[in-house]
């Protein structure tokens, strides 16, 4: 059975921002007595995201932390490098005035070493009243006199004990507190590392007061649909389609994309995934693709498959950046932006392409009630797939080859909605289409 979510979320298109980078914050936390009112300045970008075609602002970490935002020290206060709680209130109000929803990044799998409960454990030892909030190893020697479970081997990221009811109480309070202040949605960082039963206990308490909140979890590998069913989340991130898009285009092996779209179609019976071609953890699309001509086909997939699309800031302008596995290796993909849109260079064609494809998506709002049919054509360099419901069809053709592709689609008629090619009714009821080399075609 499909997860039932708020109607607004089914038609959301997010513009994702990593605030500490976007707003040019210091690499490490600032004194609490000197908050920098940066968050409220994001209001200058609301018109920009609306003009792009988005209706949601997805914020990366904003809570008090030591460094990059994922080492939280206080879930109830805004990082002084970004401002105060009132600054976030101002931003949320400005977004809501324009019909824009706001999502926060909830880091609840782990905390920073400066998190008060962990500081107590360091100071008082395993006898601390909140020692059970963590996975401690009192027999393991170390600078603290004991060992503790670290997230993915990072000493600065202390894993929480999700079997402890007090941890569930804390997370439910945090989520409810910020929803009370107007937050519409949550991204759950590293959800894949948390047992789904934890969220099954937490989320009903949040939804009791906020039934329309939309909650999606970060999942990379694993059983996406199973996790959604067992956890009560509304959605998870669709990394399978993300990887298949750029990998199949680079390799000119569109069988990989066909396989991923088939798995994606299976997920739609359970939930509507969060789709993307880039985020704060990945090499940017413009750098990931080996042929810049394939940016357009990649975006065509993003905005035509059922899902909740997200555009990572800068991708709409063709920004480049490579993620590196080292300290500071995310800096290139999380850069500062100007204080307002007037500071940007003139829009590149990719910006207009985003707007055009988002326009196609908006004019075909039925897509999120549809499914992806088995591709009509799959070759190494060409794929043709249809998105269909009971009364609509949208056909998409990608051509990564060096020559114009000619093929017949099993649909009676249609007009070109976007792309570089032609469509004409064939003699036997099919549709004859041509698609230029290294391009795409969308027919509705």
What would you call each of these model-derived segments?
Residues 3-14, 18-55, 62-181, 199-202, ...:
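Substrate-binding/active-site clefts of carbohydrate-active enzymes
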Residues 7-10, 25, 29-34, 258-262, ...:
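Loop/helix patches that line or flank the sugar-binding groove of alpha-linked glycan CAZymes
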Residues 54, 183-184, 233-234, 307-308:
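A structural motif
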Residues 92-98, 119-123, 173-176, 189-269, ...:
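Active-site-proximal helices and loops of the catalytic beta/alpha 8
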Residues 154, 419, 436-440:
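Tight coil/turn sites that cap or link beta-strands
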Residues 410-422:
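Solvent-exposed beta-hairpin/edge-strand motifs
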Residues 427-444:
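C-terminal beta-strand-rich structural cap/linker in extracellular carbohydrate-active enzymes
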């Amino acid at each position: 059975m499909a997860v039932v979510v708020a109607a607004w979320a089914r038609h959301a298109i997010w513009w994702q921002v990593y605030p500490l980078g976007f707003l040019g914050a210091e690499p490490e936390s600032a004194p609490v007595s000197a908050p920098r009112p940066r968050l409220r300045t994001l209001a200058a970008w609301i018109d920009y995201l609306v003009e792009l075609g988005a209706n949601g602002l997805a914020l990366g970490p904003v809570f008090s932390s030591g460094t990059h935002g994922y080492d939280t020290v206080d879930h109830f206060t805004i990082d002084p490098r970004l401002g105060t709680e009132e600054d976030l209130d101002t931003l949320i109000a400005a977004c809501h005035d324009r019909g824009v929803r706001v999502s926060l990044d909830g880091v609840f799998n782990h905390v920073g070493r400066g998190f008060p409960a962990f500081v107590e454990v360091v100071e008082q030892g395993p006898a601390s009243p909140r020692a059970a909030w963590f996975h401690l190893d009192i027999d393991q020697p170390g600078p603290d006199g004991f060992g503790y479970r670290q997230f993915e081997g990072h000493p600065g990221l202390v894993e929480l004990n999700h079997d402890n009811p007090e941890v569930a109480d804390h997370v439910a309070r945090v989520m409810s507190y910020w929803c009370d202040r107007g937050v519409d949605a949550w991204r759950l960082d590293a959800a894949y590392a948390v047992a789904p039963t934890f969220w099954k206990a937490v989320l009903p308490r949040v939804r009791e007061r906020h039934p329309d909140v939309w909650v999606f979890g970060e999942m990379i590998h694993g059983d996406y649909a199973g996790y959604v069913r067992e956890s009560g989340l509304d959605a998870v991130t669709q990394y399978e389609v993300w990887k298949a898009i750029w990998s199949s285009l680079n390799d000119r092996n569109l069988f990989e994309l066909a396989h991923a779209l088939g798995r994606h179609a299976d997920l739609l019976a359970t939930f509507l995934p969060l789709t993307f071609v880039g985020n704060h953890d990945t090499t940017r699309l413009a750098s990931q693709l080996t042929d810049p001509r394939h940016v357009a086909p990649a975006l065509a997939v993003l905005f035509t498959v059922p899902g909740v699309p997200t555009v990572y800031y800068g991708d709409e302008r063709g920004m480049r950046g490579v993620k590196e596995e080292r300290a500071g290796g995310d800096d290139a993909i999380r850069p500062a932006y100007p204080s307002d849109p007037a500071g940007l260079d003139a829009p590149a064609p990719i910006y207009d392409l985003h707007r055009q494809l988002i326009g196609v998506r908006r004019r075909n709002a039925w897509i999120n009630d549809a499914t992806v049919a088995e591709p009509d054509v799959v070759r190494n360099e060409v794929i043709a797939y249809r998105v269909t419901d009971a009364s609509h069809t949208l056909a998409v053709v990608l051509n990564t080859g060096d020559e114009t592709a000619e093929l017949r689609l099993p649909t009676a008629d249609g007009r070109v909605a976007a792309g570089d090619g032609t469509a004409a009714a064939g003699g036997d009821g099919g549709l004859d289409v041509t698609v230029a080399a290294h391009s795409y075609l969308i027919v509705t």
